[in-house]
Amino acid sequence: MNETDDAPLHARVRLFLCGDVMTGRGIDQILPHPGAPRLYERYCRSARDYVRLAERANGELPARVDCAYPWGDALAELDRVRPHVRIVNLETAITTSDARWPDKAVLYRMHPRNVGCVSSARIDCCVLANNHSLDWGREGLADTLDTLRRAGIRTASAGDDDAHAARPATLGVAPGRRVLVYAYAAETSGVPPSWAATPRRGGLNYLADLSSGRATQIGERIAAQRREGDLVVVSLHWGGNWGFEIGDDEHAFAHRLIDTGAADIVYGHSSHHVKGIEIYRERLILYGCGDCLNDYEGIHGHQPFRPDLALMYFPVLDAGSGALVELSAVPMQIRNLRLQRAPADGKAWLHAVLERESRRFGTHVSACDVDGLHVHW
């Protein structure tokens, strides 16, 4: 748990959530202990190519940076807001394994000695339910789990069998007060069924479909496990990488998790850009948080989605009821493979897009000079 001087813990709990944290490939190459750079992509055969692309776009990078470097201005924001709990979707394996997943071309890995890139932001929980956690096989997943465990960072959605993978990360915030993080890797995000954990095989907490029956089953299971005083985050890696559309099945699935009493926050990710926000029955639904850290700098083809922009989400929940009390989001830009405060045009773009995409849910967004964007409902 991270200390905070915010409202008393018995009254409110503030969280930090963000989208995909992709610290492998190009970012790993500038950290103190870069892993083997070999890639198997059609256009790039070395992770160093992504460093060169970033330099071509925005100037020379240091040959080596410290592990905190990629977080840049985000660290000051975290110090300012002081959330009780910090949760990210870590979309890279932490391993030196060379046993890449067969027939998979786009692979992410970070050297285990660079785990400080995660711990420097004092992250409490890494969600591993995504389509890169097994890029380097089950050996790579085991290395990731072991490295994070030794760093004192909890994980959700992955384990050495299905029971372990289904277990929530339990984050204590005060006596009798916990935040539980359940996480699911949906087939719709490109996670293959073979990555599912089984009674005899390690893997992910796999979500085969977004049916009403599946949502009810998951929701009732979580509702039965939560105790009085618990707050529950349900993390879903779902949908494609590009496009603002929110499917009817995603909408209904999120609602069902809340209707069953399972989720206080539905924390969605996979899209490389922000998507709409809904407040349903006083519960927060983030349909797509966008990327937080990536090495896409200098890559062309998706500029209309502004993959260089990121949001730091800071929801505040009523500790007694789980209801959303307030939500702010701080705009960032990825430049020189690190987070910096978004320039005025970037902040305006995020404001306009969030307002446009959230309006259908009765959610509205306003800009504030102090801490970025405020969400209203």
Please name every model-derived segment.
Residues 1-377:
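Acidic, metal/ion-coordinating pockets
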